[in-house]
Each structure stands twice: as C-alpha cells, then as structure tokens.
C-alpha cells in the first residue's frame, strides 16, 4: 500500500465522502465513471461492486455497443487497466448468464477469465437488504498479441439442477458447478 496510489470514482456524494474519510490519501472523485478523466492502460487493478440496472451509459468510446450500466463498467474498466492488469467485480449473474453475449464477446478476445464464483441470492440480504444472485468475476487484461488461455465463458448452456429443471447458465459454471454456492432453482424473478 505504501507505494501504491488509490483512485476511486463514486457518483453518490455521501458514499464518496465516506470513502474520502476512510481513505484520506486516496484520490476519490465524486462523479460518474463515464465522465471520470482516467488514463487508459494505467491502472493495475480495477475493483467494483458494479451498479445494477438496465439503462445505457453515454460514453462516445463505447456508445456503439449500447451496454447497460453493469456491462459498461466491465468494458470501460478494461480500457483503464494496463495489459496484465486485473478486473475484480461483484456483478449480477446476468453478466455471465444472459443470452445476449455481446459483453462476453467484447471482453473475451481482450481479457482472460481467471475465475468466477456464484454467490447465493442471500449473500447481501443482511447488510444491503437485497436478494440478488451475484457473481464475483476476475479477469486479466491480455498483453498485446497474447491469446487467451483461460476457460471458456462466452456461451450459455442448459444446466440441470437437483430438481431436474433446466436452467440457462454460463458454460464456465456448467463445467464447474462447485463454484455455485447455494441451490440453483428457477424463480420468476429478474435475476
């Protein structure tokens, strides 16, 4: 920590003030990620609990993809970390499981999936009051000319749970069911 610099971007003023109080030596910026002036290819690590939502973000560098906000955070962070840099995010299961693979197709040739773990929908119930199935996803930005060697994670396949229900989930988790904590079941909820 002594030889590192921490930069934080937080749109909520109260949360930004708390971060500034907790980390007085950090550069905490109270603004949206899309408007933060951050150098491309500079950061060693990007860490976020990405915002949930299905609304687009206006950013000329990524507008063509029409990424919803949580996908935008992945794509924008990939621009900001250096080759070999890491992205470690808490995100909804939609990042890995949605049938629209636009984000995964965008990321896969540029970043290697180092790993992911699926948390049960109750993981944040006590402290945040939410019941959303979330994933912790870790990516490494590839070096120029490097080919990804990590596991397959672009496609969604059917997974049969303990009740013999077929559930569409990411191929990474189909091949590694031990990385899904809790019990998989179909519900009528968004995530």
Question: Positions of the model-derived regions?
Answer:
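Conserved S-adenosyl-L-methionine
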Residues: 1-55, 84, 92-94, 137
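Conserved ATPase-coupling elements of RecA-like P-loop NTPase cores
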Residues: 55-59, 99-100
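Flexible loop residues that form catalytic
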Residues: 51, 121, 142
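Generic "edge-of-domain/loop-turn" microfeature
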Residues: 57, 96, 144-146
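Conserved Class I SAM-dependent methyltransferase catalytic core
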Residues: 9-13, 18, 30, 64-125, ...
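Short, solvent-exposed coil/turn linker segments
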Residues: 2, 32, 55, 68, ...
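A short acidic, often aromatic-flanked loop/helix-cap motif at beta-alpha or helix-coil junctions
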Residues: 34-38, 122-126, 189-190
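Flexible, glycine-/basic-rich loop-and-beta segments that form/coincide
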Residues: 126-191
């Amino acid at each position: 920590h002594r030889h590192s610099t921490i930069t934080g971007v937080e749109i909520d003023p109260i949360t930004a003030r708390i971060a500034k109080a907790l980390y007085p030596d950090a550069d905490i910026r109270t603004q949206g990620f899309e408007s933060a002036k951050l150098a491309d290819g500079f950061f060693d690590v990007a860490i976020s609990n990405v915002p949930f939502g299905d609304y687009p973000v206006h950013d000329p560098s990524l507008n063509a993809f029409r990424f919803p906000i949580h996908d935008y955070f992945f794509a924008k962070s990939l621009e900001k970390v250096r080759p070999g840099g890491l992205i470690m995010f808490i995100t909804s299961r939609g990042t890995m499981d949605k049938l629209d693979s636009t984000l995964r197709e965008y990321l896969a040739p540029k970043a290697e999936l180092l790993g992911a773990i699926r948390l049960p929908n109750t993981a944040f119930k006590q402290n945040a009051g939410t019941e959303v199935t979330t994933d912790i996803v870790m990516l490494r930005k590839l070096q120029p000319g490097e080919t990804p060697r990590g596991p397959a994670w672009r496609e969604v396949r059917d997974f049969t749970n303990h009740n013999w229900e077929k559930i569409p989930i990411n191929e990474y988790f189909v091949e590694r069911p031990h990385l899904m904590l809790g019990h998989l079941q179909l519900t009528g909820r968004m995530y």
